[in-house]
């Protein structure tokens, strides 16, 4: 079992119940899933780029990503409907907790010029979205084997009803928000 999951069950539930006055343990917000998305627009010109992106995402997430395709043709971007333009992976359960642990303890501290995560990136329903500019902050990525530095979006979906509850939940997991 991941350390963060144990921490959630042992201390976070009690803290949030006391802070927000929940009457049932089931009302306490929890992390439902983490979605990683990597847009790879260059894949239109070179098919090899997508293979590298999928390989990197597989190493980071621990499971094979789904290749996303263009929904409609856009002449300005030289893409047609059905062209592969990215990949995404949804983590739940044990893999989600392990990824969250690596993100908070290892990856975020390795971000260059890091001054804290923006607290304004909540969506109004307690979900948090963040962008990562370089995939090399993750220890699974070997710097010598990457073809190009790529970023990705990380969305943490919670069962929280408000941003305040979502922030309290992520604060309990030691997310480094700006003060």
Curated annotation (Swiss-Prot):
Keywords: Ribonucleoprotein, Ribosomal protein, RNA-binding, rRNA-binding, tRNA-binding
GO CC terms in record: cytosolic large ribosomal subunit
InterPro entries, alphabetized: Ribosomal_uL5, Ribosomal_uL5_bac-type, Ribosomal_uL5_C, Ribosomal_uL5_CS, Ribosomal_uL5_dom_sf, Ribosomal_uL5_N
Annotated PROSITE patterns: RIBOSOMAL_L5
Function comment: This is one of the proteins that bind and probably mediate the attachment of the 5S RNA into the large ribosomal subunit, where it forms part of the central protuberance. In the 70S ribosome it contacts protein S13 of the 30S subunit (bridge B1b), connecting the 2 subunits; this bridge is implicated in subunit movement. Contacts the P site tRNA; the 5S rRNA and some of its associated proteins might help stabilize positioning of ribosome-bound tRNAs.
HAMAP family for this protein: Ribosomal_uL5_B
Name of this protein: Large ribosomal subunit protein uL5
Species in which this protein is naturally found: Shewanella oneidensis (strain ATCC 700550 / JCM 31522 / CIP 106686 / LMG 19005 / NCIMB 14063 / MR-1)
The organism's taxonomic lineage, starting at the top: Bacteria, Pseudomonadati, Pseudomonadota, Gammaproteobacteria, Alteromonadales
Gene, per the UniProt record: rplE
């Amino acid at each position: 079992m991941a350390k963060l999951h144990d921490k959630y069950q042992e201390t976070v539930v009690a803290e949030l119940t006391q802070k927000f006055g929940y009457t049932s343990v089931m009302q306490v917000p929890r992390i439902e899933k983490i979605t990683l998305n990597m847009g790879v627009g260059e894949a239109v010109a070179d098919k090899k780029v997508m293979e590298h992106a999928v390989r990197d995402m597989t190493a980071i997430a621990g499971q094979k990503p789904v290749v996303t395709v263009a929904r409609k043709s856009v002449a300005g971007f030289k893409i047609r409907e059905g062209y592969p333009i990215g990949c995404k992976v949804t983590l739940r359960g044990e893999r989600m907790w392990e990824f969250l642990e690596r993100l908070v303890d290892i990856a975020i501290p390795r971000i260059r010029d890091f001054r804290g995560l923006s607290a304004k990136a909540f969506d109004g329903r307690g979900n948090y979205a963040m962008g990562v500019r370089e995939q090399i902050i993750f220890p699974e990525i070997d710097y010598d084997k990457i073809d190009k530095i790529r970023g990705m979006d990380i969305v943490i979906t919670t069962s929280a009803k408000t941003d305040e509850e979502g922030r309290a939940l992520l604060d309990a997991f030691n997310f480094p928000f700006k003060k």
